[in-house]
Every structure is written in structure tokens, then in C-alpha cells.
Amino acid sequence: MDPVLGLGLFAFALLLLALPLAFWKVSSEKTSGLVTLLIATANLALTAQLVLRWWQSGHFPISNLYESLCFLAWACTLTQLLVERSWPTPIVAAAATPMGLGCIAFASFALPDQLQEASPLVPALRSSWLVMHVSVIMVSYAALLVGSLLSVAVLVTDRGHALELRSSSIGSGGYRRAALATPLGNVGDSEVQLSSVKFTRNELLDSLSYRTITVGFLLLTVGIISGAVWANEAWGSYWSWDPKETWALICWLVYAAYLHTRLSRGWQGRRPALVASAGLVVIGVCYIGVNLLGIGLHSYGWFFG
């Protein structure tokens, strides 16, 4: 077996073991040290896979759909580990592991053999912009996907109850309101420092989701801008309304709407989580769906390994 494919399957096996273990630890409310170890080992295996493919091909391993899926799985597991450093809980693994698992499964079992092999770069990708643009876009997708999955976890753990989350996300200014009794017996609002407040599980999930999506949105913005500059150098136009470009813009607008609703503090709880969840579908169309169409400047990923 090709060692590149073998490393991918090894990472798949580790994540496949980590996922049910994470759900079991969530239900039993136990710590997630073993789950984190499995995910970290899977990330190391994916790192070795990408380095080996880079050595085999002689170029940055993100030139076809197989390589980009493996890179996305690596970025998702790394993002997941970074999020768990802020809040070491199996809920994060239970919510985010399916994304990395799905990426590896699709790359290893769904793609034709010829697309799993290393191949020369197509002419459009023979540029120094490859690493800057494509890798930043893929890392932004990873952050947005993990953040959106955490929003899905908010909706699932909410179990249909109305939420009014006031977490330490951007827009709260480091404070949240708490109802306090006044000397006259009335109930008034007072600003309470976040460091003195014990957050609920949903508040922590909401805050982590928001922060992760914010990072992903900023990276997506950088990726789109760098892609426009690259397009101008390659084809003489910053924007051509290629299907991938159009859906990248739609993706940017969806998450811009999510951040706007949070920053304005007009929406809290379930509604912004629903917007973030919709972003999962938009990224899926932008990343995979457009490639299946086989049209446009970005269609090389599926049909032309």
C-alpha cells in the first residue's frame, strides 16, 4: 500500500475510535484525555502524510481534491485541538470529529484511484500564490466548519429551550448583564465581569463557536483577497464570477451576517446558531459541489487530478 494512503487510513481509524468514545464521555461527564490523545495522534499522522506527499510530488500538497481533503482534515483536527485548549471537554470532540473523519473517508473511499495519486501541478497552479491563497482558504474552511459544528452542538444540547446567551464573545465588551435586586425591591440590570461568572455549558459552546468562526471569517477574507490578486496576475481580472468565486462570496456573506447579528447584540442564542449551521451547507457547495459541476476555472480538483 502507498504509505501516503496508509497514513490517511491510520488517521481515519484513530478518529473512528475517538468519535464514539467522545460521545460516551459526554454522556458520562468524564474527562476527555484519551480522546484528545487519539485526535492529536491522528493529526500527527495527517501531518506525516502531507509531508510525505509533498516530498513525493515536489510541490505543496494541495493541488487536487484528494490532497485538499487531507489538508482540510489536518486543519480541522488541529483547529479542534486548539479549541479544546480553551475548554477541555469531550463535547468539542463529539461535535467536530465527524468533519475530519468525513474528509478522510471521502478522500480514501470515494475518490477514484487516479485522483489519489501524486500528479504534476496544472499550469494555473504553478505560482507562488498557491500556498498563500489555497492554504489560507482551506484553513479558513476548517475554522468555519468547526465553529459551525459547535453551533450545531448548541442547538442540540439546547433541546428546544429558548436561550439568551451572554457569553464572552466579541460584542459583550468583557461583561454581561445580570439581574440584581435594588434597595427598593426592584430588579435592575448590572454589568458583571465575565471572570466572576460561572458559564453554563451552552454559553461556553456559544463563545467558542463565535471565536472560532471569527478567526475563520478573517482568514476567509484574506484568502479571497489573495485569490483576487492571483487571478489578476494570471488572467488579467480580479473577479470573473466563476462558480467557485461566486459561492465563496456567498459563504463570506453568510458568515458576515452571522457576525453582524452577534456584534449588534440583536440576536442571541438559537438564531445566530442557525445561521452558522446554514454555513455548513454553503461551504459544502462551495468546496465540493462546485467541483462536481466540472465547470469554471476551479473545476480541476475533481475531474483533472
From Swiss-Prot:
Q: Which residues cross the membrane?
A: 4-24, 32-52, 58-78, 91-111, 136-156, 212-232, 246-263, 275-295
Keyword Phosphoprotein on entry: no
Pfam families annotated for this entry? Cytochrom_C_asm
Alphabetically ordered keywords of this record: Cytochrome c-type biogenesis, Membrane, Thylakoid, Transmembrane, Transmembrane helix
Membrane topology classification: Multi-pass membrane protein
GO cellular component terms? Answer: plasma membrane-derived thylakoid membrane
Task: Give a GO molecular function annotation for the protein.
Answer: heme binding
Domain of life, source organism: Bacteria
Indicate where this protein is primarily found: membrane
What is known about its subunit structure? May interact with ccs1.
Family classification: Belongs to the CcmF/CycK/Ccl1/NrfE/CcsA family.
Give the protein's function: Required during biogenesis of c-type cytochromes (cytochrome c6 and cytochrome f) at the step of heme attachment.
Write the protein's name.
Cytochrome c biogenesis protein CcsA
Its gene? ccsA
